[in-house]
Amino acid sequence: AKNNRDWLESEAYQNRQIPLDYQLGAGQLNAFRAYQQFSSGQHPPTASVPPVGWDYQTIDTSGEYQDYLLDRPLVENSWVSTTLVWDRLVELRDTNQNNEYDVGEAFRDRGLNRLELYLMHVEDNQIDRNVWASTSNVDSIQHIFYQVRDPGKYKIRVYSRQAVNA
């Protein structure tokens, strides 16, 4: 890391609008941990979710949200690491309709939906009562890395602040 700083000293750790550190990103890649995460399977928000997993849902409307209730309480001084990523919609202006890019054709940027990520106590429903959040308005990634101070039941909320395309 630049200047021998670690993630806990980065602007991203301290600022809710900066999801990744400029030098460190989200930190060191642990390939085995990534394997474990994907091996645990997809867990939609229809039931409580385990501490390790992933989901591939969509949110199409501004103001819509998905809550992921963690299936066990978080203990004091434990760490929460959660990441939300999504794609910007770009369409090919396919003038000859062959469904392939040809020289001279262009792309149309449909804009970037603004999604936000919140760590909340399970009983709270207002996002302004969050414990921590990642709320960048210019990135297609949100990331929370947070040390739990108050043990208890938590949920992760994915919130659509602004949907510019669906």
Question: Can you describe what each PLM-predicted range is?
Answer:
Residues 1-6:
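Short, well-structured alpha-helical segments that form the helix of a local strand-helix-strand
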